[in-house]
């Protein structure tokens, strides 16, 4: 991919990109995708959503550990809306923790940081965390 080529050409040897893949650690796997929030009938949005669901599915299915932690850019749950396609996949695959970004500033006050249908969701955008990294899990 373009990103992997850029990383390699610039000698960034501590950065890896999730792309239809996962990273396996001792006892858990990190999975993810950009995700999407489908709230329109536009054909383009449906196409992007379907592609992102397939990417996330590939990422989760590539994981070797039972515990899988998912990271998304877009929130699958926001205010009184949710992205049922992403949520259904997370439930189908037994995901218990999902971290997401995208929401900044005033939009972050509407973030969903709670359990929804058996999955714990948490907004981890940099400004929400006051630019202090959040320890997800020690390994």
Stretches found by the model and what they are:
Residues 2-85, 89, 138:
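Conserved catalytic scaffold of divalent metal-dependent phosphoesterases
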Residues 12-15, 102-105, 118:
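Short amphipathic alpha-helical surface micro-motifs
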Residues 24, 47, 88-94, 106-139:
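Binuclear metal-dependent phosphoesterase catalytic core
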Residues 7-10, 99-100, 123:
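Intrinsically disordered, low-complexity segments enriched in polar/charged residues with Gly/Pro
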Residues 68, 96-97:
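The start of beta-strands in P-loop NTPase/AAA+ ATPase cores
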Residues 1-2, 22-24, 38-41, 75-81, ...:
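Active-site environment of divalent metal-dependent phosphoester hydrolases
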Residues 71-73, 101, 124:
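A cross-family glycoside hydrolase active-site/sugar-binding cleft signature
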């Amino acid at each position: 991919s373009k990103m992997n080529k850029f990383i390699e050409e610039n000698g960034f040897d501590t950065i890896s990109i999730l792309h239809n893949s996962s990273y396996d650690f001792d006892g858990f796997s990190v999975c993810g995708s950009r995700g999407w929030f489908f709230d329109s009938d536009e054909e383009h949005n449906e196409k992007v959503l379907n592609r992102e669901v397939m990417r996330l599915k590939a990422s989760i299915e590539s994981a070797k550990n039972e515990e899988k932690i998912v990271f998304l850019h877009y929130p699958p749950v926001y205010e009184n809306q949710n992205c049922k396609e992403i949520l259904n996949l997370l439930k189908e695959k037994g995901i218990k923790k999902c971290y997401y970004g995208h929401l900044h500033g005033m939009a972050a006050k509407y973030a969903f940081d709670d359990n929804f249908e058996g999955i714990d969701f948490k907004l981890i955008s940099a400004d929400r965390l006051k630019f202090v990294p959040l320890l997800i899990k020690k390994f």
